[in-house]
Regions:
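Conserved, mostly hydrophobic/aromatic
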Residues: 10, 64, 111, 225
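A short alpha/beta connector and helix-capping loop motif
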Residues: 15-47
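Glycine-rich tight-turn/loop motif centered on a GG-T
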Residues: 19, 33-40, 73-90, 121-125, ...
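Acidic (Asp/Glu)-rich catalytic clusters
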Residues: 24-28, 49-62, 102-105
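Glycine/small-residue-rich loop that forms an oxyanion/phosphate-binding "nest" at active or ligand-binding sites
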Residues: 70-110
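Flexible, glycine/charged-enriched surface loops at secondary-structure junctions
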Residues: 105-109, 207-217, 249-254
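C-terminal domain-boundary segment and adjacent tail
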Residues: 142, 236-254
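Active-site rim beta-loop-alpha module in soluble metabolic enzymes
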Residues: 149-207
Length: 254
């Protein structure tokens, strides 16, 4: 049986030369690039440059929109209707994705929300619905990359959108199958061997070991390594090599 999986990384976010070099290098090992659209990072110049690098590397392009919150890198949780008006958020997300589509000359294949927007939409039905409506409004052929067995999954199904579940190589999971908050010690996995072990477990068994040591199911068609984490390029390289050795074809889902 043909086995394949996607490797994705967040890109277009760099704020230092070293980080930018890491983003460029990681293109050699991933199959999909989530490109920041200006909400938490990036501008038209970085979008054009990152999209070009992805295209030259044969990497699928995805939009990585966020709350319009550059100050907090899109990682501050906001309450819909209190901290941000739903209409304002909807317009911001639409504009972010549309700008990337212009920068990439229409070659955007999917959408992956960023940071707090992603984490909250896993559990918040109204927020997931808003994101789904924005994707439909932009282009109903766009796929949606997000948390498996989540409100995002349900929102995509209700709107007839293609949905791909994602697993994280470098993040701990809680017992409910969602990510441990970054503020907690150990939430970001920094050890390369531990990252590789989690990647292989996600790909081969569709399971991970939670923070409390419980085995939980994660149905992931794409594995993410955060481009801003230390050692990201090496993680992508060894993960790709190990997956190929295990019989997987590294292939974009869209």
């Amino acid at each position: 049986m043909d086995k394949f999986i996607d490797l994705n990384a967040d890109t277009g976010e760099a704020s230092t030369p070293d980080w930018a070099a890491s983003e460029a290098a990681i293109m050699d090992y991933i199959s999909s690039a989530n490109i920041a659209c200006g909400g938490h990072a990036g501008d038209m110049e970085t979008m054009v440059d990152t999209a070009r690098r992805a295209q030259e590397s044969g990497v699928s392009i995805g939009a990585h929109p966020s709350y319009p919150d550059r100050k907090n890198f899109g990682r501050l949780e906001l309450t819909l209707g209190e901290d941000i008006d739903p209409k304002i958020l909807s317009e911001s997300l639409y504009e972010q994705i549309a700008r990337l589509m212009d920068a990439a000359k229409g070659e955007v294949k999917y959408v992956k929300p960023h940071g707090a927007l992603y984490n909250q939409a896993v559990k918040a039905k109204p927020l997931a619905a808003l994101i789904g409506d924005v994707i439909l409004r932009v282009d109903s052929s766009l796929s949606w990359l997000g948390g498996p067995s989540s409100e995002m999954t349900q929102a995509a199904q209700e709107r007839g959108l293609s949905f791909i579940g994602e697993g994280f190589i470098d993040r701990q999971y809680s017992e409910d199958g969602h990510l441990v908050a970054r503020a907690l010690d150990g939430a970001v996995i920094r050890d390369q061997e531990a990252r590789l072990a989690q990647a292989l477990s996600l790909a081969k068994t569709k399971h991970v070991t939670s923070r409390a040591g419980q085995k939980i199911s994660i149905e992931a068609g794409s594995l993410c390594v955060h481009g801003d984490s230390a050692g990201a390029v090496e993680t992508a390289r060894v993960t790709r090599d190990a997956l190929i050795e295990a019989g997987f074809d590294i292939r974009a889902f869209a």
